[in-house]
């Protein structure tokens, strides 16, 4: 067993190898503070045929014992990955995936297992570093050393790996990954910070990354691992290179620079098929061998197309859909499309379209959070759906994909900044984004549609939030930043850079970079160009709806809340919940009680019944005085009068002489009657007189 220790950022780091998981191709036991993860790497001996991508899977396995907890539910064991586990898997996958050889076709599986959790030392960020180290000491071809850090910003100071308490007060919460040469991934949120503050956070992160990479280098130099050979191509490589001669650049340019996404794809495929057939005929490639050339020829065609697109952007500043580098696609916005929903919007930017829907619910509908670290509830939820018809494809409909969960999480972090506090707006808010069309930047379209729909629903947001996806083309030191990228520019570009925020600052940030050498100045330019675009998009949102609607939808529940003495919470609940259940049934409402603060929340579809329930409960805790007026319920009828309950357990007599001209027998149990308190004797017994309707 080998062991390496170092103190970094005020906490001890430990890497171990050779003690556990020795049958894996690569394994690292990593400890940071009291957080411990095991990163393992394994690779298949067989090549996967017929694919044009690296078959990599990354799994983040959360174990509840790591936090000293037993899983909830009937089955007391871990099941399929949780949403937080999926997000952590993506966080590890994104910085390591670009470092595999493009022609690796053996299945690679990276598993990061969480064994111990320290709330002040994030296991997902530790997982990035542990996975990098496990890959580098394995036989899997892997070109680079990456590390991850978390950055906070408290009281004007940037903090590397802030504590949980510091994160509560932090204006920035981002995870940054990279090599010693460059930042390659960013994911996080902020509380309306400036572009300069975000840039300095990135620079602080990179300096910290260099230290962790240097520690990894100390470990890796002690291993002399022979990397597995990459598969030899079965086709004639020289013949594939010759295929380039069949591509007419003028014809190719016409097809790449077609205006519409589908038109562009159809024209490009049509041209490709025509030259491939000629290539096969001219080079006498028999039909049974043509299948072997299908993927390499298409890759070569895409490579030439990519180079041409990039060259024209660099030299002419012209993009595939005819825009300049800073141009934003045409934007249209609508609100109030769906009559029965609580709020709705349609945001369209070019060929990307998001239908945003808001649903308001009672506090009882809060989402329960039970992760390794976090326990509690969540009152703002955003879900992102990406159906296959949005790209004109046919695919089976299953549960949400990892991509959908990741995009929804980013949009939720962006919009969360404008959600009013619970004491101002006690509703549970669910936003759903249905992507109806997609050609790049659908997560940022989701941010925009969500902001519009929230105002349409009457949620008292103080401002709009918008997002934009930026790109980068970097050739021989010359870089062009692209605003509002389409799918092709995302696929063939060097960077996908998403920024969301209000007019006052950035609220969410995500970046994936495929190249090194992105300078601080280029990042600054990208941030400020994104700000310019964001302001333009925000103006479009404000033109559509400038402030929240004054009234909620008639179909939204009505909510009222107030406080009672928390020491008397038991009186509202009653024995076995009898009292609160009877009130719920009586008024057809939902009631939630926080017995620690005494906060009572009443919700229901009928506003009048909600108000009646509120008054009923408030009366329960109000001292009864002579002259008070109540609406009560008849509980007993006698010859000498009727007994009326004005609140649970508070029953008094209306003597026949106090009923006016009505006899007691005119009433029946359950009738409602308005009464006035006319006497309270020494024993606390109540006497009422009937009030005329």
Curated annotation (Swiss-Prot):
Record EC number: 2.7.7.8
Residues holding Mg(2+): 490, 496
Domain of life: Bacteria
GO CC terms in record: cytosol
Molecular-function GO terms, alphabetical: 3'-5'-RNA exonuclease activity; magnesium ion binding; polyribonucleotide nucleotidyltransferase activity; RNA binding
GO BP annotation list: mRNA catabolic process; RNA processing
Localization, UniProt: Cytoplasm
Keyword Transmembrane: no
Keywords tagged on the record: Cytoplasm, Magnesium, Metal-binding, Nucleotidyltransferase, RNA-binding, Transferase
InterPro entries attached to this UniProt entry: ExoRNase_PH_dom1 (IPR001247), ExoRNase_PH_dom2 (IPR015847), ExoRNase_PH_dom2_sf (IPR036345), KH_dom (IPR004087), KH_dom_type_1 (IPR004088), KH_dom_type_1_sf (IPR036612), NA-bd_OB-fold (IPR012340), PNPase (IPR012162)
Principal cellular location given in the protein's record: cytoplasm
Reaction(s) catalysed (UniProt annotation): RNA(n+1) + phosphate = RNA(n) + a ribonucleoside 5'-diphosphate
KH domain mapped to chain residues: 557-617
Entry similarity comment: Belongs to the polyribonucleotide nucleotidyltransferase family.
Role of this protein: Involved in mRNA degradation. Catalyzes the phosphorolysis of single-stranded polyribonucleotides processively in the 3'- to 5'-direction.
NCBIfam families tied to this protein: polynuc_phos, PRK11824.1
The protein, known as: Polyribonucleotide nucleotidyltransferase
């Amino acid at each position: 067993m080998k062991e390496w220790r170092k103190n970094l950022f005020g906490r001890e780091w430990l890497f171990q190898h050779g003690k556990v998981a020795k049958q894996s191709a690569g394994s690292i036991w990593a400890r940071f503070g009291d957080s411990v993860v095991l990163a393992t790497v394994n690779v298949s001996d067989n090549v996967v045929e017929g694919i044009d991508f690296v078959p990599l899977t990354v799994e983040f396995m959360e174990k509840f014992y790591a936090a000293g907890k037993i899983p909830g539910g009937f089955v007391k064991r871990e099941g399929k990955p949780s949403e937080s586990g999926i997000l952590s898997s993506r966080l590890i996958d994104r910085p390591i995936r670009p470092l595999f050889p493009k022609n690796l076709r053996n299945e690679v599986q990276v598993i990061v297992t969480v064994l111990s959790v320290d709330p002040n030392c994030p296991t997902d960020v530790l997982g990035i570093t542990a996975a990098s180290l496990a890959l580098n000491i394995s036989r899997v071809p892997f070109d680079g050393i990456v590390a991850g850090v978390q950055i906070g910003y408290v009281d004007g100071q940037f903090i590397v790996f802030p504590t949980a308490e510091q994160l509560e007060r932090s204006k920035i919460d981002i995870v940054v990954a990279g090599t010693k040469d460059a930042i390659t991934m960013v994911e996080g949120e902020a509380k309306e910070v400036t572009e300069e503050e975000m840039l300095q956070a990135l620079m602080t992160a990179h300096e910290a990354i260099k230290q962790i990479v240097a520690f990894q280098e100390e470990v890796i130099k002690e291993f002399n691992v022979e990397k597995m050979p990459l598969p030899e191509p079965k086709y004639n490589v020289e013949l594939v290179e010759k295929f380039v001669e069949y591509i007419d650049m003028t014809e190719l340019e016409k097809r790449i620079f077609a205006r519409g996404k589908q038109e562009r794809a159809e024209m490009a495929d049509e041209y490709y098929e025509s030259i491939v057939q000629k290539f096969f005929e001219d080079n006498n490639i028999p039909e049974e061998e043509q299948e072997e050339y299908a993927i390499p020829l298409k890759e070569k065609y895409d490579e030439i197309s990519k180079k041409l697109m990039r060259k024209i952007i660099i030299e002419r500043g012209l993009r595939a859909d005819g825009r300049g580098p800073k141009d934003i696609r045409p934007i249209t916005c609508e609100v109030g499309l769906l009559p029965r929903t609580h709020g709705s919007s349609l945001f369209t930017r070019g060929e990307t379209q998001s239908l945003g829907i808001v649903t308001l619910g009672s506090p009882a509908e809060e989402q329960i959070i039970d992760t390794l670290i976090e326990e509690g509830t969540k009152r703002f939820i955003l879900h992102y759906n990406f159906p296959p018809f949005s790209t004109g494809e046919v695919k089976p409909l299953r549960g949400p994909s990892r991509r959908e969960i990741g995009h929804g999480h980013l949009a939720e972090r962006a919009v969360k900044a404008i959600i009013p506090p619970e004491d101002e707006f006690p509703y549970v808010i669910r936003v759903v984004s249905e992507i109806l069309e997609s050609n790049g930047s659908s997560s940022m379209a989701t941010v925009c549609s969500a902001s519009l729909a929230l105002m349409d629903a009457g949620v008292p947001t103080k401002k709009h939030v918008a997002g934009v996806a930026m790109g980068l083309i970097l050739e021989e030191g010359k870089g062009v930043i692209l605003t509002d990228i389409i799918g092709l520019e995302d696929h063939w570009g060097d960077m996908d850079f998403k920024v969301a925020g209000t007019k006052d600052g950035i609220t969410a940030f995500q970046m994936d970079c495929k190249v090194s050498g992105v300078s601080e100045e280029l990042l600054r330019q990208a941030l400020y160009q994104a700000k310019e675009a964001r302001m333009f998009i925000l103006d479009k949102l404000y033109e559509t709806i400038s402030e929240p609607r004054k009234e909620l939808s008639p179909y939204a529940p009505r909510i009222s809340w107030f406080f009672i003495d928390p020491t008397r919470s038991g009186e509202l609940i009653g024995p076995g919940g009898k009292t609160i259940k009877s009130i719920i049934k009586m008024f057809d409402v939902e009631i939630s009680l926080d017995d620690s603060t005494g906060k009572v929340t009443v919700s229901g579809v009928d506003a009048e019944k909600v108000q009646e329930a509120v008054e009923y409960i408030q009366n329960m805790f109000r001292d009864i005085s002579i002259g008070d007026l109540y609406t009560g319920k008849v509980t007993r009828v006698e010859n000498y009068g009727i007994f009326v309950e004005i609140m649970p357990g508070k029953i008094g007599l209306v003597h026949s002489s106090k009923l006016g001209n009505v006899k007691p027998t005119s009433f029946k149990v359950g009738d409602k009657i308005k009464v006035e308190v006319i006497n309270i004797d020494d024993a606390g017994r109540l006497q009422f007189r009937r009030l005329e309707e």
